[in-house]
Swiss-Prot record:
Pathway where it operates: Amino-acid biosynthesis; L-histidine biosynthesis; L-histidine from 5-phospho-alpha-D-ribose 1-diphosphate: step 2/9
SUPFAM superfamilies cross-referenced by the UniProt entry: all-alpha NTP pyrophosphatases
Catalytic activity: 1-(5-phospho-beta-D-ribosyl)-ATP + H2O = 1-(5-phospho-beta-D-ribosyl)-5'-AMP + diphosphate + H(+)
Protein name from the UniProt record: Phosphoribosyl-ATP pyrophosphatase
Family: Belongs to the PRA-PH family.
InterPro entries (UniProt xref): HisE (IPR008179), PRib-ATP_PPHydrolase-like (IPR021130)
PANTHER family tied to this protein: HISTIDINE BIOSYNTHESIS BIFUNCTIONAL PROTEIN, HISTIDINE BIOSYNTHESIS BIFUNCTIONAL PROTEIN HISIE
HAMAP family membership: HisE (MF_01020)
């Protein structure tokens, strides 16, 4: 099973939970609470990932990275996006200098 396969399946599962019972699904609970709740969880999980990385504990880094990725996928699903949208953008950027790619977006 490829990394893309598991992320694609998870992305589909998350999208299917959008209207599930928040009492029975953590993902549905996040959806029902809205983007602020999802963003808060992403922030918390990123902080935990940073701490795991600072401690140099490889297994904890994997666990916390998994939590960050999960919550980012929830955010994408909340906005009707999926890992495929991110994959397409990564393919577009492949082989382009990060400096050049960022400059091509112009100012915000």
């Amino acid at each position: 099973m490829s990394t893309h396969d598991i992320l694609h399946r998870l992305s589909e599962t998350l999208a299917s939970r959008r209207h599930a019972d928040p009492e029975k699904s953590y993902t549905a609970k996040l959806f029902s609470e809205g983007p602020d709740s999802i963003l808060k969880k992403i922030g918390e999980e990123c902080a935990e990932l940073i701490m795991a990385a600072k401690d140099g504990k490889r297994l904890n880094i994997v666990w916390e990275s998994t939590d960050v990725i999960y919550h980012v996928l929830v955010l994408l699903a909340f906005y009707g996006l999926s890992i495929e949208d991110v994959s397409q953008e990564m393919r577009r950027r492949e082989g382009i200098s990060g400096i050049d790619e960022k400059a091509s977006r112009g100012t915000k």
